[in-house]
Amino acid sequence: MVITLPSPQVGAYPCGYSSARLGTRTQSCARDLTRLRREVVTIACVSVIPLVFTSGWASGINAYAVVLLLGLFGATGVSDEVPAALQRTDVLIVAGVLFLCEAVADKIPYVDSVWDTAHTVIRPVAGAVVAALLAGESGSLPELAAGAIGGSTALMSHLVKAGTRMAVNTSPEPFSNIGLSIAEDLGVAGIVTFAVFNPVAAAVIAAVLLALGIVTVLFLASRIRRFLRRRAQRRAEKRPAPAGGLRPDG
């Protein structure tokens, strides 16, 4: 039995038709690849924003703790998203020493407010720098945009902390300062650690805490004004009296 195979029909699929079809498929694949790249960049951008926001919030409360924790997580291999600049030994040593200084100053009445005043610029700048480094490590978000997010968030949380401390300092007992300082340190450590493993959930918690802090400061506005008046009075009392013991007419 002989099986005869059909001979191919020459010219059934012209060369021009095949080339056009191939070109169309190539263009379609290129468009799909471009769209896929955009989606990947968008997903990466969205994934780094929560960590940027959380690190900014935490930096406004204790910037040295944020740098120290992230640096240790990167140096020990806990997280691959930590920039190499934060893992340097000299950075970790300086951050650790300053963290210990803040841990002491932050628990002493009135000294904590002086410390907060000195860090009105330092904390937002630290939040912006850490956020920019995180964005640069991921390569998905412009460093300038990340710095703006981290710096503004750090400034807001710093103002909440400073305002709350002013209100607490109207009370003569020191235990409120100590308890609040310990709660802040533990909160920063816990949320930054949580952000390394679940950045979205940590960002939600940080946003809720920031909103609650703003509401609390508004509620304590009268105490804050009282603290500012007392500080102004103490400064006026420390001024040297004019010659002859007479005060200038006001």
Predicted segments, located by residue:
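Mid-bilayer segments of alpha-helical transmembrane spans in multi-pass integral membrane proteins
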Residues: 125-133, 143-164, 186
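Short, highly charged, low-complexity non-transmembrane loops/tails of multi-pass membrane proteins
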Residues: 227-247
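C-terminal ends of transmembrane helices
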Residues: 100-113, 161-169
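Small-residue-rich segments of transmembrane alpha-helices in multi-pass membrane proteins
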Residues: 120-132, 176-190, 238-240
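Cytoplasmic-side transmembrane-helix entry/capping segments in multi-pass membrane proteins
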Residues: 88, 113-125
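Helix-coil boundary and interhelical linker segments in multi-pass alpha-helical membrane proteins
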Residues: 41-47, 73-89, 131-146, 195-204
